[in-house]
């Protein structure tokens, strides 16, 4: 039964990411899974319940995977020791890791595409997309920068503004790769250049700049 439930979640997300949430029926999901529509209700009472389960499992999946590379999006305090006195090369490597993971992990990529498709049709999806791919990232990096400014490792600038400057190009490059996968190499080069410039502009080495 658990295998069937997992297949329902996987096939639903696949369909939602290509056609949009509203355009997919329960019958279509059941057909993709290889079961009859009434059987699907033995596992989930509604399409909304399927979406809620996808949201929960995707969030857990993301938090587990990113924690392995010391990125705790909802608790930046855990990662301050990782980013304190980090080298330019290591910072570039870590940003590349999270960027490539977000781009190529099947579950995360499909979930982002689903939200992107639905953002203009549903205020709920628009809010969720902003929360996951803007608000959380800004809050996370602002928390890191706030600690580094206090420690004298970053220039004494507003941490929230620094976070917006840092995160915005990354979000743009991710969206470019979603729309045009053939531009991945170009986007990675731009990502590296952005992180290096930010590091050299705001990092303090041997005193205030």
How would you name each of these model-derived features?
Residues 67-106, 163-166:
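Hydrophobic alpha-helical connector segments
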């Amino acid at each position: 039964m658990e295998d069937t439930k997992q297949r329902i979640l996987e096939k639903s997300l696949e369909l939602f990411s290509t056609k949009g949430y509203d355009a997919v029926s329960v019958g279509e999901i059941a057909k993709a899974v290889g079961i009859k529509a009434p059987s699907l209700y033995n596992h989930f009472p509604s399409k909304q319940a399927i979406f809620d389960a996808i949201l929960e499992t995707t969030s857990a999946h993301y938090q587990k995977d990113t924690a392995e590379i010391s990125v705790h999006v909802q608790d930046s305090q855990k990662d301050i020791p990782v980013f304190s006195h980090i080298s330019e090369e290591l910072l570039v490597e870590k940003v590349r890791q999270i960027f490539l993971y977000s781009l190529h992990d099947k579950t995360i990529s499909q979930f982002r595409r689903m939200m992107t498709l639905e953002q203009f049709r549903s205020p709920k999806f628009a809010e969720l997309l902003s929360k996951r791919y803007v608000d959380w990232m800004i809050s996370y990096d602002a928390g890191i920068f706030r600690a580094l400014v206090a420690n004298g490792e970053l220039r004494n600038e507003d941490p929230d503004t620094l976070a917006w400057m840092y995160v915005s190009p990354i979000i743009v490059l991710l969206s470019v790769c979603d729309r045009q996968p053939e531009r991945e190499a170009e986007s990675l080069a731009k990502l590296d250049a952005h992180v290096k410039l930010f590091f050299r502009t705001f990092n303090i080495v041997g005193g205030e700049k």
